[in-house]
């Protein structure tokens, strides 16, 4: 988030080893270089019913999109998913960004909603959407059938699962002409937009089979039905060996040599 009045940019770093471990060593006043910006602002339409589907760190992005959608007269139904109960943060901001929230957690006992009209669910996010759409969670303050737009942000596997579920177990609860996009988390490198092609993402037309390529750094919001998630998974794994070596080397330096 950005506070223009104070000139502050707020960031959230996920502790996964390697460079994230270096972030733990930062002290107030240390210089930090941010590269970018990449991507394109998410398109927000007026007076729609919008379904936000967030997994893990994706929720750090979605609450700003939800706030913008509500400001444009949209109804916002938010499925916020987490692996563990300790992973949840920015609860007040998420609540302010949605009319109705389904808090999903893989870990029991899950979350207890603090607002009337919100729900808690133990299980994955697709299961939560099915439970909500079927009425298993109770009356729907916002009907899933009214959804004009679905915006999914999270891991590549979560977005792929949502994309597939729309045509299978979620199909009875969605109208045919809804529009679904995902914020594609392609690997980045140059941060200069359409230069290095590290973020190149294959698309496959479901009707013709034609394959095209786009730069995710130019526009991260891509139609779920077009994205080749197998290709994305391969791209995300391409630096796996180097990333593991870097993580072990930094861990060795920080914990064993210090």
Write out the residue ranges for each language-model feature.
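Cofactor-binding loop segments of dinucleotide-utilizing enzymes, especially the Rossmann-like FAD-
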Residues: 14-16, 37, 55, 81-83, ...
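Reductase modules of NAD(P)H-dependent flavoproteins
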Residues: 86-258
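FAD-binding FR-type
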Residues: 1-51
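Conserved S-adenosyl-L-methionine
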Residues: 69-76, 99
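Histidine-anchored nucleotide/phosphate-binding helix
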Residues: 59-70
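Structural beta-sheet core signal
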Residues: 51-52, 77-80, 103, 152
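Short, glycine-rich nucleotide/cofactor-binding loops
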Residues: 49-59
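Short amphipathic alpha-helical segments
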Residues: 24, 47, 64-66, 91, ...
């Amino acid at each position: 988030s950005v506070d223009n009045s104070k000139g502050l940019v707020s960031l959230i770093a996920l502790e996964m080893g390697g460079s994230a471990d270096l972030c733990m060593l930062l002290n107030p006043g240390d210089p930090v270089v941010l590269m970018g910006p990449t991507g394109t602002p998410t398109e927000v339409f007026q007076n729609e019913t919008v379904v936000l589907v967030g997994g893990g760190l994706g929720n750090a992005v979605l609450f700003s999109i939800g706030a913008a959608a509500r400001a444009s007269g949209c109804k916002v139904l938010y499925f916020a998913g987490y692996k563990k109960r300790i992973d949840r943060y920015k609860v007040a901001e998420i609540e302010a960004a949605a009319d109705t929230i389904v808090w999903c957690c893989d870990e029991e006992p899950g979350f207890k909603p603090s607002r009337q009209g919100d729900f808690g669910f133990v299980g994955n996010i697709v299961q939560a959407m099915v439970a909500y759409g079927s009425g298993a969670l109770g009356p729907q303050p916002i009907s899933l059938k009214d959804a004009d737009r679905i915006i999914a942000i999270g891991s590549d596997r979560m977005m792929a699962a949502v994309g597939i579920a729309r045509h299978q177990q979620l199909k009875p609860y969605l109208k045919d002409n809804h529009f679904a996009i995902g914020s594609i988390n392609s690997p980045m490198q140059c941060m200069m937009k359409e230069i290095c092609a590290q973020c190149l993402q294959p698309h496959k037309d479901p009707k013709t089979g034609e394959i095209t390529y786009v730069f995710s750094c130019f526009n991260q919001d891509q139609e779920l039905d077009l994205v080749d998630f197998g290709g994305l998974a391969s791209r995300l794994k391409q630096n796996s060996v180097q990333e593991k070596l870097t993580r072990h080397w930094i861990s060795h330096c920080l914990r064993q040599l210090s």
